[in-house]
């Protein structure tokens, strides 16, 4: 039997942004016993000695006082360093392009934070993610957020039944404009705060400069797959598949793009033209595949997939593998599919799960230059 809202404790992960602020407000208005928790995941002091986390926490304090809910901060810096940041660096070292948001959701927000919330008597946790949870046919389904421009299920692809049974997404049914309007009408301190962009621990800083503090740059040669040298690079980890800007290749004609990298030889491979065949692949192998239902499909099946966050769904056939991975065959050749990024599967509105892109193929042949 479900408890009444006033007997149900919901711990809200609050970032100091408008989305989590409105999530907390809506739960409070619905009568839940709400506690706000600020997760301190990164020791971040900028060049001026200002810690952005301190500013964000001050916004959490203001909002919680306005709403009338208790709040406090919890430090997850060690877990974040061990589980998210170390993974991030290791992937870059290996020449891949990782997605730290996926790992942060898996290891911090829906693991360390969830466990902490349960230890203080929470019935549920809630976040400001644009996603929805529904219980039907005897299981929890994760559905896309109602605002197609803000849907965040791509980053939540590693969640399963244990997490979804304990999670609320109070703004998942709303458009972003509605969230802003609700915050404004309630006079919340964060109503006009701009959305954070980029990777949380880098913030507004220059990515190359940030990474160089942890991974010393190793400049090297930039060449075509035929071996023609086109210039020098600053370090292969600074570039991603499909990248166009910052290559410094002169001359006329179509622009040049990164098509691959060889970490061992420290070579960056480039090709000319947006439609260059070297940018395209027809299938991939994914590892660490998670199924939201907790049930691995027995047979190949058709669905749609995304290979990056801001990409329209494409038709694919998924072949589950015995090792827990999956082979994903595309209906049409796909451009700049990048090892290290997430491949996420959908059936209409439902997010089925996802994994990490490990290898990329064209017509059955592994693209050796992609990594």
UniProtKB/Swiss-Prot annotation:
InterPro entries referenced in this protein's UniProt entry, alphabetically: MnmA-like, MnmA-like_C, MnmA-like_central, MnmA-like_central_sf, Rossmann-like_a/b/a_fold
Compartments it resides in: Cytoplasm
Keyword line: ATP-binding, Cytoplasm, Disulfide bond, Nucleotide-binding, RNA-binding, Transferase, tRNA processing, tRNA-binding
The enzyme's E.C. designation: 2.8.1.13
Pfam assignment, any one: tRNA_Me_trans
Keyword tRNA-binding part of the UniProt annotation: yes
Site residues by UniProt (Interaction with tRNA): 129, 341
Active-site residues, record numbering mapped to chain: 104, 200
Region Interaction with target base in tRNA, residue ranges: 99-101
UniProt-annotated stretches for the region Interaction with tRNA: 150-152, 308-309
Keyword Glycoprotein: no
GO molecular function: ATP binding; tRNA binding; tRNA-uridine 2-sulfurtransferase activity
Catalytic activity field: S-sulfanyl-L-cysteinyl-[protein] + uridine(34) in tRNA + AH2 + ATP = 2-thiouridine(34) in tRNA + L-cysteinyl-[protein] + A + AMP + diphosphate + H(+)
Disulfide cysteine pairs (residue numbers): 104-200
Stretches assigned to coiled coil: none
Gene3D superfamilies for the chain: Adenine nucleotide alpha hydrolases-like domains, HUPs, Translation factors
Main EC class the enzyme belongs to: transferase
UniProt similarity note: Belongs to the MnmA/TRMU family.
PANTHER family reported for this sequence: MITOCHONDRIAL TRNA-SPECIFIC 2-THIOURIDYLASE 1, TRNA 5-METHYLAMINOMETHYL-2-THIOURIDYLATE -METHYLTRANSFERASE
Function (record text): Catalyzes the 2-thiolation of uridine at the wobble position (U34) of tRNA, leading to the formation of s(2)U34.
Name of the protein in question: tRNA-specific 2-thiouridylase MnmA 2
Gene this chain is encoded by: mnmA2
């Amino acid at each position: 039997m479900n408890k009444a809202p006033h007997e149900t404790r919901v711990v809200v992960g609050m970032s100091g942004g408008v989305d989590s602020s409105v999530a907390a407000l809506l739960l409070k208005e619905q009568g839940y016993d709400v506690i706000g928790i600020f997760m301190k995941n990164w020791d971040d002091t900028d060049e001026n000695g200002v810690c952005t986390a301190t500013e964000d926490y001050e916004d959490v304090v203001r909002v919680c006082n306005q709403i009338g809910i208790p709040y406090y901060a919890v430090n997850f810096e060690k877990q974040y360093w061990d589980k998210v940041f170390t993974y991030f660096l290791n992937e870059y070292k290996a020449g891949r392009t990782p997605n730290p948001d996926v790992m942060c959701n898996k290891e911090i927000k829906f693991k360390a934070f969830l466990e902490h919330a349960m230890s203080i008597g929470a019935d549920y946790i809630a976040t400001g993610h644009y996603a929805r949870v529904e219980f039907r046919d005897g299981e929890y389904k994760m559905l896309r957020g109602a605002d197609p421009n803000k849907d965040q299920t791509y980053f939540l692809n590693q969640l399963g039944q244990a997490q979804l049974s304990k999670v609320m997404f109070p703004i998942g049914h709303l458009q972003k404009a509605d969230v802003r309007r609700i915050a404004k009408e309630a006079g919340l301190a964060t109503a006009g705060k701009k959305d954070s962009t980029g990777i949380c621990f880098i913030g507004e800083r220059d990515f190359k400069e940030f990474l160089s503090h942890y991974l010393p740059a190793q400049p090297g040669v930039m060449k075509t797959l035929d071996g023609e040298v086109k210039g020098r690079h600053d370090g292969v980890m600074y570039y991603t598949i499909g990248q166009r800007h910052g290559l410094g290749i002169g001359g006329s004609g179509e622009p040049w793009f990164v098509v691959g990298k060889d970490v061992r030889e420290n070579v960056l491979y480039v090709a000319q033209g947006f439609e260059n065949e070297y940018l395209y692949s027809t299938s991939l192998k994914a590892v660490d595949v998670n199924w939201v239902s907790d049930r691995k499909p027995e047979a190949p099946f058709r669905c749609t997939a995304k290979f990056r966050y801001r990409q329209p769904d494409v038709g694919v056939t998924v072949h589950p593998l015995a090792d827990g991975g999956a082979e994903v065959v595309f209906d049409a050749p796909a451009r700049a599919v990048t090892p290290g990024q997430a491949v996420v599967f959908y059936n209409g509105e439902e997010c089925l799960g996802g994994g990490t892109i490990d290898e990329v193929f064209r017509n059955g042949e592994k693209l050796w230059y992609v990594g």
